[in-house]
Amino acid sequence: MPDRYAHCTFCGARFVPDQPWPRRCGACGETSYLNPKPVAVAVQPVGGGLLVVRRGIPPARDTLALPGGFVEAGETWQQAASRELSEEVGLRTDPEAVRLYDTISAPDGTLLIFGLFPALATPDELPPAAPDDETLGFEVLHEPRALGFDLHTRVANRYFAQVAAGL
């Protein structure tokens, strides 16, 4: 597999193959870092359940997951989580209303930021499902189950445990 980061971002010179990070360029002396891209994930309660989407793209294609995606340049994580809910579900939310629920680093170094949105009273408050290339639909889970990503499963299980405990 080709190394996407095989060249210095400052001068374009090729790094030594398999050079560890951070990488110091032998040509210009600058140091390059490989930083994680944060992912904003929406935890959207609906009538005691939890909103999930069926993924239409890899990884974890055709599995259930919490709505989410990469934070774009110029966005706060709250704006990104709100945007992802809009893109994947069609649900319009206020980024100012989202609260930090959890942050977890994935084994590959990706930082996941889970944002808790105000609960919707019933599924009737959700827009009609409109599948597209990325999302095949959505549903409301009413009990814990395995999701397409282990960290999503962990957060969903925690949410349901808190609901059961009356928290």
Task: Describe every region a protein language model picked out.
Residues 45-87:
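Conserved Nudix-box catalytic region and its N-terminal flanking loop in Nudix hydrolases
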Residues 27-28, 44-47, 95:
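Extended, polar beta-sheet/loop recognition surfaces of beta-rich domains
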Residues 92-102:
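A short coil-to-beta-strand element that immediately follows conserved catalytic motifs
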Residues 127-161:
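NUDIX/MutT-family hydrolases
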Residues 1-41:
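Acidic, metal-coordinating catalytic segment for phosphate/diphosphate chemistry
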Residues 35, 102-128, 139-143, 162:
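Active-site-adjacent beta-strand/loop module that shapes the phosphate/pyrophosphate-binding cleft
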